[in-house]
Each structure stands twice: as C-alpha cells, then as structure tokens.
Amino acid sequence: MHNIPPEESLIEYPSDFPIKVMGKQHPEFAQTLTEVVLQFDPGFDPASVEMRPSKGGNYLGLTFTVRATSREQLDSLYRALHGHPMVSIVL
C-alpha cells in the first residue's frame, strides 16, 4: 500500500463509504461477511446490507456502507474481506 498524506486523500474522514463484495452463493455468506465488517465498524447496521444475486443465481453481491474513520481502517477492512475464503472480489 502507498502512504498517501491525508491532505491528498480523495476521501474525507469520517464518511459513509460503500464496499462491494462478491462471492459464490452460500447460505451463510452475508452473515459471515457482516461479522467481518462489524470487527472494523462496530456501529454498522446489519439490516443495511444490500444483496444482489447474479442472474444465474450462482453468485451473490453484497454492499456494505461502513462509517470510514481512517485510511488505515478501510485498508484493514479491505484486506480482511479480500483474504476471506468465501470472497471472490472486493470493490
């Protein structure tokens, strides 16, 4: 990761920040990843997760809108989601 000075960041903190996650359809996909998100944003509301199944129903897309408080928080959350075995893509 590159160190970007706060004055050069395109994100102002704190702010609401959407993170999109895709993975294969699994009964516990949304719940499992919500638990990961809660580790980085304890105030996250699980009822706010947006879910979109793929056209064929094999994949599920989730959008988590987290309260971003720092670049470090977002970077750590992205790493945790990207490294999770149920996750295919994080945007």
UniProtKB/Swiss-Prot annotation:
Disulfide bonds: none annotated. Coiled coil: none annotated. Belongs to the UPF0250 family. PANTHER family: UPF0250 PROTEIN YBED. It comes from the Bacteria. This is UPF0250 protein BP0104.
